[in-house]
Amino acid sequence: MGQTQSANENVQVFGERTKLIDETKKFYKNFNKLEQFYLKENFTALGKNVNGKVVWTEDTFCTFFGIPDVFRLSEFLFHSACRIGGCQNYGGIDYIGMVRFIAAYTGRYKNVWKDDECLWKIVYSWTIPNAPLRSSGSSLTSSLASSFNLVKLGKTNATRQPTIPCSVLISLFTLLLCIGDFQSGDVFADHISMLISSSVQEKRSYAMSLLRGVYPDPLAKSMSLKSVFLFLQSNSYALRRLGYLFEIIMYQRNQHPHRLVEQRSSGLLMDRYSLRPQLEMFIPPEVFSDCKFVHLFNSEQHGYSMSSLEKCSSSFSGNTLLLIRALPLDASHADRRARQFLQKIPPKNKSLSGMLMQDVIKDSSRELVFGAYITGQWKESASSGFGDQSTYLFNLRPYHQIFRATRVSNEYCFFDKHFGIAFGLENSKKKTVSLLRKDGVILYVDNMLDFGFFRHTSRGVYSMGRNFDDICYEEFFEIQEVELLGMKPLRKE
């Protein structure tokens, strides 16, 4: 009986390995000839014979990819590569595993895996299972398929999910933000020099906004696989930067002209507060590579005036990016106008179901950054709005979330000099304060560009944040700076 079971397991493992090889052959076709050459050349040159199999050991992998020690990610990425490559019990990563690892992180899995399937495999490779996994390729493959199908059906049990340590996620997010500063044409040595500079600490503080975007629990030591997957699913371009880094190293190129876009001049607020790397996680890459940012309006340059904003925005017909930097506002504020604003829009009370964000994040001195990606031309009107289903709201700090249009409405933005700027309101011929008392995902800026508020209580014109369905978030704020950037397509030569 035992021999029969063992034989069946061997057949299963052999079948899984055969499938792995067949998949890898398809991945390999997605690499061009030069990339195939460098991949094979580098692997052969550094491979070592371990138990009769040529592999890259952990030391070889970490030395070759050379992620600076300040991130403490080399060992983590090696184990991720082994799990994606199906090499957990080889004492290293073999050539098939290396091809699969590079393909997964650089987008060369197309026509073999779907995007969500690949993302799930990557995130799964980061986890620390609550229960020990058998190391055979078959059991890992079965676990992957089973867990992925359960998530798609919404049947996962949070207590049984594998988890990812928050410390690892912070380091990973910090690395992604640092890579976001790379410029086309820089040599790799300059990249590494930048990565180990003092800017890493600044990026680490911003990485906390990303971690809070996965789930805003400051006491959490780890995040569930599903939470991280859903966060990265909504920030679908986040991992591309990590793939770019692997490409630069593996293929010995100083630049990837079709991958790393040149950092052209962007908005003042975007530059000064390092917002671009976060924006590039969810705004399509072609927006940055095929468009030039045009400075339409900045409150510090043009004044805190709705008339100035209208004048600066009305003549631009393309898509725009609105950025708002602010500080929290509460009832103890000394300014009379601030108190009047708070009285005009009463806060929602705690009878609302769900967790209140204020119970999670209590630092009143924290910086707030809100914004919107707006498709179509701005128009000033008391009765009609603008934008389409490609418009979305976002919050970059103190937590990172995107709120996409739900197609409930065909008017997503309202701009009225007498009322203010509003996103997420019900369609109405007349805009009044009563509309702001409704539930939903709403961003409002008053007609003096002084104060505003953001509310996250239910699905409406915009969807709720991923993993935030049970959280009621309401923030009143005092505006520090407003910026509007136009996106002007570059001429094709």
From Swiss-Prot:
Q: Name one GO cellular component term.
A: cytoplasm
Q: Superkingdom of the source?
A: Eukaryota
Q: Where is the signal peptide?
A: none
> Which keywords has UniProt assigned to this entry?
Cytoplasm
Question: What is the similarity comment for this entry?
Answer: Belongs to the RTC5 family.
Role summary: May be involved in a process influencing telomere capping.
- Name of the protein in question: Restriction of telomere capping protein 5
